[in-house]
Amino acid sequence: GVCALMAWMTGKYGVSLLLPLLKVIGAVYLGCLLHVLGVYSSLLILLARLNPLHYFKSIVDAQAVAFTSSSSSSTLPISLACAERRLGVSPAITAKVLPIGATINMDGTALYQGVTALFVAQAFGVDLHVVDYLTIISIATLASIGTAGTPGTGLMLLTLTLTAVGLPLEGVALIAGIDRILDMARTTVNVSGDILVSVLIARSEKELDLAIYHDASVGEDIDFTLR
């Protein structure tokens, strides 16, 4: 189905329309990388007074599963194990925060909505006004609050975004061809953010085992069997 859509778009608008898709992939991945390394690191340092390097080292397995599965829900067991056994977050915190985080706190999805909507506008030569930008921001925010943690959900939300600002829905066919690649990046951000929130809450509630968090040997013994 996606192949047929891409073939139709190429025949109608030419191959030159597909080349900028590489820029979209680069923009989404760069945005996700800056968000994780910049925003998440800053939150750990400023709000929790914790070393972000330990955090990133401890969640690498959850990020790997998120990247390959493109599903926050499928990554949930690994996220729980990383948060509890590698970061020292209390099970009482992870049991509440991470399952909820699988459907909300979708920062990567919000970033994806903004970048792809702007790409579609440029690809079809549509000029956006201030109101349109505000609409995109609003929908992206709503997308980050509540989205199913399954692959491809962001693409369905993109249809809503394009419709809201009057952009042609043919743009969905363009994005569909690379959506899986983009989904891998945004899911990694979503999962990383969920674990981060559990650490911040545990830290504020004094439910964080600092001995485990700062353990230099973390990751050497990989056992994801949940207690």
Language-model segments: which ranges?
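Hydrophobic transmembrane alpha-helices of secondary-active transporters
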Residues: 1-13, 116, 120
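Alpha-helical membrane-inserting segments
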Residues: 7, 30, 34-46, 120, ...
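Interfacial helix-loop-helix linkers and transmembrane-helix boundary segments
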Residues: 10-23, 44-56
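Entry/N-cap segments of selected transmembrane alpha helices
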Residues: 14-40
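Hydrophobic transmembrane alpha-helical segments of multi-pass transport and channel proteins
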Residues: 29-33, 66-71, 103-111, 141-153, ...
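Membrane-interfacial loop-to-helix junctions in multi-pass transporters
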Residues: 30-32, 45-55, 87-94, 125-135, ...
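Helix-loop-helix junctions within the multi-pass membrane cores of secondary transporters/permeases
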Residues: 61-144, 198, 210-222
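Hydrophobic alpha-helical transmembrane segments of membrane transport and translocation systems
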Residues: 154-220
